[in-house]
């Protein structure tokens, strides 16, 4: 290797290392449970929410035609078997926070999807639960957070009057894989 090549190698080595480091850190994937500072929808979720209106339990009763395709976040309160292998979820509706709460602001892997502490309504969602969410430690159960995209036809549950929707897509966050706004005080850095 001649002197010119050695000099060029020395001059470009820091640039190369910086580029490699930048590429490695830029490729952080929030994964299925959204470990990122800001909410990161999955590709399927982005497609499913196209044309959906965020669910409003009051306005949806007044103008159900505006909420034919709707989407919402909520915490599962109850899950019961429904007809034809479907599941009936009773959901406490929550507002998703703009920023996720992170245990360590320098490590996105400590960030969790964050929703409000209080509910702003309730809804029943009839969904097909995926096999990986059906049983086991990470099963969809009371305490899970869900992002649901659904069809709404103005129906209400006869027993409690809550709106009933038919899920066309969901994203599941098992208990302890998301946070509520109250966790911010505990995790303050």
Question: Could you say what each language-model-derived stretch is?
Answer:
Residues 27-189:
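OB-fold and OB-like single-stranded nucleic-acid-recognition modules
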Residues 2-16:
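Bacterial N-terminal signal peptides that target proteins for export
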């Amino acid at each position: 290797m001649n002197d010119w090549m050695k000099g060029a190698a020395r001059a470009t080595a820091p640039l190369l290392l910086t580029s490699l480091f930048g590429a490695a850190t830029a490729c952080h994937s929030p994964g299925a449970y959204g470990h990122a500072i800001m909410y990161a929808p999955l590709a399927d979720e982005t497609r499913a929410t196209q044309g959906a209106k965020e669910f409003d339990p009051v306005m949806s009763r007044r103008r159900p035609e505006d909420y034919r395709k709707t989407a919402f976040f909520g915490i599962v309160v109850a899950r019961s078997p429904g007809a034809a292998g479907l599941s009936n979820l009773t959901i406490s509706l929550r507002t998703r926070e703009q920023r996720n709460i992170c245990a360590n602001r320098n490590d996105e892997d400590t960030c969790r999807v964050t929703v409000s502490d209080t509910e702003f309504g309730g809804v029943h969602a009839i969904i097909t639960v995926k096999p990986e969410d059906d049983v086991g430690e990470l099963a969809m159960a009371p305490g899970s957070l869900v992002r649901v995209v659904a069809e709404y036809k103005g129906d209400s549950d006869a027993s409690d009057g809550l709106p009933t929707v038919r899920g066309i897509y969901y994203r599941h966050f098992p208990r302890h894989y998301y946070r509520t706004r109250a966790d911010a005080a505990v995790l303050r850095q």
